[in-house]
From Swiss-Prot:
Entry annotated with the keyword Signal: yes
Signal peptide per UniProt: 1-17
Keyword Protease: no
Role according to the record: Aerial growth, conidiation, and dispersal of filamentous fungi in the environment rely upon a capability of their secreting small amphipathic proteins called hydrophobins (HPBs) with low sequence identity. Class I can self-assemble into an outermost layer of rodlet bundles on aerial cell surfaces, conferring cellular hydrophobicity that supports fungal growth, development and dispersal; whereas Class II form highly ordered films at water-air interfaces through intermolecular interactions but contribute nothing to the rodlet structure.
Protein name: Unclassified hydrophobin F
Highest taxon in the source lineage: Eukaryota
Gene ablation phenotype (knockout): Affects hydrophobicity only when HfbC, HfbD and HfbE are also deleted. Disruption of all 7 hydrophobins leads to altered germination kinetics, decreased survival under exposure to extreme cold stress and increased mycotoxins patulin and citrinin production.
Disulfide bonds: C24-C75, C39-C67, C40-C58, C76-C85
Length: 97
């Protein structure tokens, strides 16, 4: 019985260690800019661009994760100090890619 429990624990750890990728599409505000994943705390609607939000207080992500407030990261491109965000990160199972 003990061997079965150890085998089950090993299988369970392999399943929970699944590799996840995150991906950002090109900007959806007709600029076609390449976007990167950010967690932004001050997103507001962009002036003159109904398909985007803008922010200054952002942290760029390099690992798949949720933001501190458990929200999905935004996909943004930069113009000067501003981040222009037009969509959200897409999380995918690495085996699907």
């Amino acid at each position: 019985m003990r061997v079965s429990a150890l085998a089950f624990a090993a299988v369970l750890s392999l399943v929970s260690a699944k590799k996840i990728n995150m991906h950002c599409n090109f900007a959806e505000d007709h600029t076609g800019m390449v976007q990167q994943p950010y967690c932004c705390r001050d997103l507001v609607p962009a002036r003159g661009n109904s398909k985007a939000n803008e922010a200054l207080d952002c942290d760029q992500l390099d690992q798949p994760q949720l933001c501190d407030d458990q929200s999905r990261p935004a996909c943004c491109y930069t113009i000067g100090a501003k981040k222009i965000c037009t969509s959200h990160v897409i999380f995918q199972d690495a085996e699907d890619v």
